[in-house]
Amino acid sequence: MRKILKLKIGRDELVFETGFMAKQANGSVLATYGGSSVLATVCCSNNVREDLDFVPLSVEYNEKYYAAGKIPGGFIKREGKPKDKEILVSRLIDRPMRPLFDKRFGREIQVIPTTLATDQLNPPDIVGMNAAFTAVFLSDIPFNGPIAAVRMVYLNGKFIVNPSFEEIHDSDLDIVVAGSLNGITMVEGGANEVSEDILLSAIDGAHEYIKQICNAQKEFLDIVGEKEKLPLAFEEKIFEFKEELKDFIYTDLKEACFVKGKLNRDKAITLLRNKSYEHFSSLEKLTDSNESLFYKAFDDFEREIVRNSILNDKIRTDGRTPNEIRDIIAEVDILSRTHGSALFTRGETQALAVTTLGTSIDEQIMDDIDGDKRLNFMLHYNFPPFSVGETGRLMTGRREIGHGHLAQRALESMVPGKNDFPYTIRVVSEILESNGSSSMATVCAGSMSLMSAGVPVKRQVAGIAMGLISEGDKYVVLSDILGEEDHLGDMDFKVAGTKNGITGFQMDIKIENVTKHLMRDALEQARIGRMHILSVMDTVISDSRVGISKYAPKIVQLQIDIDKISLVIGSTGKTVKAITDEFEVKVQIEQNGKIILFGDDDFKMQKAKERIESIVREPKVGEIYEGIVKKINSFGAFIELTPTKEGFLSTRLKSRDNKYGSGRFGTGNRYPRFGGGDNIRGNVGLVRPPKLEEGQQIKVKIIDIDKFGKIDLEVVRDKDY
């Protein structure tokens, strides 16, 4: 039976509906905000696995073109593989939900939010998040909900919840926040150098709306009726010889956990793990049924040692204090033929960023249900297996897309717009080593690479990843976390920004929620760390280079009247093609009359610009042109002034008192001009004309333009005849 619940959030009502679509799923909810609707379903497998120590959750957000009344572009007229946007929204849904599933459930869980309609005013991603959270909460799958999400922007000094696309575009802060009744579970967004106080205020305001949606979900559950929850697949089992294992390894494991260097530390821990495995195998205390419990017990002891050292002694596995940042080495211009390059090394994490400048032809065209877009700034993040000393496939996965998007958001508010810098900009980050915080190393390397390439960025940007170790009310915030601190800790909070404020951030937690006080501490510690990193980067490069690389394409711009565009293009593109071929340039003509020339030769580009200016220039009486004789007849000669303009050189000799003499044109004859000089047969003011042939260049002057635009010319002479 169809059930409906409505609540007002911001400018529109958020509507939840269930019981009439996709009823065979474990849970299904249709959520609508304004004119945007998303159907979310959740299903679980019937196969139970007791050997899982993680939640086998997959989220597949997808958008249908029919939702916007569109048909997919390209040859294949159906939706294909997930676009980057769909992957990013899937991650937004996955990350706050994952910690709230019970690992003991032991079944594969799949959540599929599908955008069925969009009004192109309200972004469907937030609608999809709430549809998915509500579908799981109403289902029979064990889930520690409810949770909800909203988007907040900061625009003209005010916070707006669930803004329109236009408000997002114009805002100084765009943040997506997910949370429960008790606190925040996920934060992600970008900003234009906002302060920590503004960010915290946005999160605070978002949580108030989140609590309203969570309470509405509980009310909806009462209306629909709570389903009997599926049983957990297994109870938490403990390795029966755990205390013996502790006695055997604990002292040695304490030493191994604090060996200097990631590879050496991993090697020491692995040797001890193998040694203890062989020991318990020899005692016949390991079987197929408890082998996984043995490894879990070993990992639990490692986790306990590392966390206790940080909480109680404030010492991390590499010997640093909680707020200490690893040694930083920064370099620029390390690749000779690229347009810009930088290498950023922080401890055992290293990112090589390379900037390439292209033309508007290189822009990325996005065929999207929210409207087609053209991106002239892109950042691509690559994480090859050798960066962690492993073998594997070279491929772009969801993690690479997510990390690249975060780094791009951190940098894009500092990148100039098309009007100020009409290049397409692509930054590629190659992670050469990784031991934590590679996405923030990408931000640092990318910022320096842009400056190296001569991109006039507003300010330098740096990023840092913060961690958390907590036990009850006791907690320690960590600066510049290692990979193992991310794995064993409770939070991964990435913050990027300039000296003036924050430009990008992302927070994920593994505990139920974090408090405002804890977030304030983390942001302040991140700010201090960011200032330190920026100071190191500024010693290498602090401002963008003046001028771009000699290997980058050159650009010349000019503005013409809109009604002159057709003159530049010419019949069937003849004129613009001639310019392209003659001067070896690419010509981009925009609808507003802006013309951009791309090429490699400055001289040829300047000549191409002059040619276009001459084409669109309105002729005036008294102007002098280097014309070409196009046609000669008995009445005169037609002179091409520009590819789109001709003037007429009359056959009759004109004197200074505007009286005409006699004479006829013909190839090889001499023709008249007005302007004095030698006399012919004693007639004052009549001059001996030059000899002309078709195709010949001749210097002429405009002497008259009638109301119909007809141009009369006279010959300009450099010397007397």
Curated annotation (Swiss-Prot):
Subcellular localization, as worded in the UniProt entry: Cytoplasm
Binding site residues for Mg(2+): 486, 492
Keywords: Cytoplasm, Magnesium, Metal-binding, Nucleotidyltransferase, RNA-binding, Transferase
Domain S1 motif, residue spans: 622-716
Gene3D superfamilies per UniProt: GHMP Kinase, N-terminal domain, K Homology domain, type 1, Nucleic acid-binding proteins
Protein name (record): Polyribonucleotide nucleotidyltransferase
Lineage: Bacteria, Pseudomonadati, Spirochaetota, Spirochaetia, Spirochaetales
Domain of life of the organism encoding this protein: Bacteria
Keyword Nucleotidyltransferase included in the entry's annotation: yes
Disulfide bonds: none
Single GO MF descriptor: polyribonucleotide nucleotidyltransferase activity
Coiled-coil regions listed: none
Recorded catalytic activity of this chain's protein: RNA(n+1) + phosphate = RNA(n) + a ribonucleoside 5'-diphosphate
Cofactors: Mg(2+)
